[in-house]
């Protein structure tokens, strides 16, 4: 499948700790088998050097919004023009991919002619460069299972899809809230199967700060770019997340149809809220706060 998959990414500047974890992530992509084509976008510091040293394709120019943030539409468009691959995967540049990634994509492709494959990240504190000259994956995955924290269903860090899936993409700013939910919504609205690959191919998100964004994390989630992305996302009774996946790729490679995951989680959260409210007198006597009780509430299971 080497010629059939192209991974595309828009890294941040390769400076300090973010430079270390991006180099870790992108190097891991070169180790999956068969090796995919990899396209790195942007003029950010260190991008060209990283591409040259790892034998990647580098496309320097990319359309940006008024704040200088790259636009998803141009990245998708340029990738399909520059590569002959049948499949593409947009991956955030701090995500370490396991060897099972390409195998998972192949399973999904054999089942569906059209699809969107996504996955939840597991957050892990990684401070040093990984040594890829030895068996790096097994120790890292063991540490991930021991120390990592599985992100919520909103933590979507890759999108894999066949050529021609995304057309008429609005000017969404990448790395800002709502751009990833838009990708899931687009597929679901068109009847395209959305496959959650998390159980089969766990991905590692290396934790980092938000110093690369002028307004910090607040700008990413609640700044004007987030507001603009929400406008392009459109009306919503709810956000499309990994809970909106129609299928789940199991650890044994089987595809399981999923129903009503979002609705079940919403019902559990509503029931827990009712429990918290009804037990207020008892909790008050015990000195338990509502916020602490809610924080201990129902967690997602198997989603």
What are these regions (language model features)?
Residues 4-5, 27-39, 56:
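Short loop->beta transition adjacent to catalytic acidic/histidine clusters or analogous donor-positioning motifs
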Residues 36-43, 117-118:
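Short, hydrophobic beta-strand segments that form beta-sheet elements in well-ordered domains
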Residues 80, 96-181, 185:
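Conserved catalytic core of nucleotide-sugar-dependent glycosyltransferases
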């Amino acid at each position: 499948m080497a010629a059939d998959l192209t991974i595309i990414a828009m890294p941040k500047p390769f400076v300090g700790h973010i430079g270390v974890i991006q180099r870790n992530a992108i190097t891991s992509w070169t180790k999956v088998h068969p090796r995919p084509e990899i396209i790195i976008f942007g003029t950010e510091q260190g991008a060209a050097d990283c591409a040259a040293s790892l034998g990647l394709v580098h496309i320097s120019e990319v359309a940006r919004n008024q704040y200088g943030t790259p636009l998803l539409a141009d990245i998708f468009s340029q990738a399909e023009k520059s590569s002959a691959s049948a499949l593409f995967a947009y991956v955030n540049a701090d995500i370490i991919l396991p060897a099972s990634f390409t195998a998972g994509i192949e399973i999904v492709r054999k089942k569906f002619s059209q699809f969107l494959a996504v996955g939840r990240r597991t957050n892990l504190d990684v401070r040093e460069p990984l040594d890829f000259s030895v068996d790096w994956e097994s120790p890292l995955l063991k540490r991930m299972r021991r120390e990592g924290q599985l992100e919520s269903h909103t933590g979507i860090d890759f999108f894999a899809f066949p050529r021609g899936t995304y057309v008429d993409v609005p000017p969404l700013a990448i790395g800002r809230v709502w751009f990833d939910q838009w990708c899931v919504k687009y597929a679901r609205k068109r009847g395209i199967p959305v496959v959650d690959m998390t159980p089969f191919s766990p991905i590692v998100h290396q934790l980092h700060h938000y110093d690369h964004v002028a307004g910090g994390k607040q700008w990413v989630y609640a700044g004007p770019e987030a507001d603009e992305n929400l406008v392009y996302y459109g009306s919503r009774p709810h956000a499309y997340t990994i809970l909106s996946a129609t299928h789940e790729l199991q650890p044994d490679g089987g595809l399981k149809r999923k129903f009503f995951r979002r609705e079940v989680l919403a019902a559990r959260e509503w029931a827990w809220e009712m429990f918290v409210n009804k037990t207020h007198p008892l909790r008050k006597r015990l000195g338990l706060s509502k916020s602490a009780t809610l924080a201990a509430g129902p967690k997602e299971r198997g989603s």
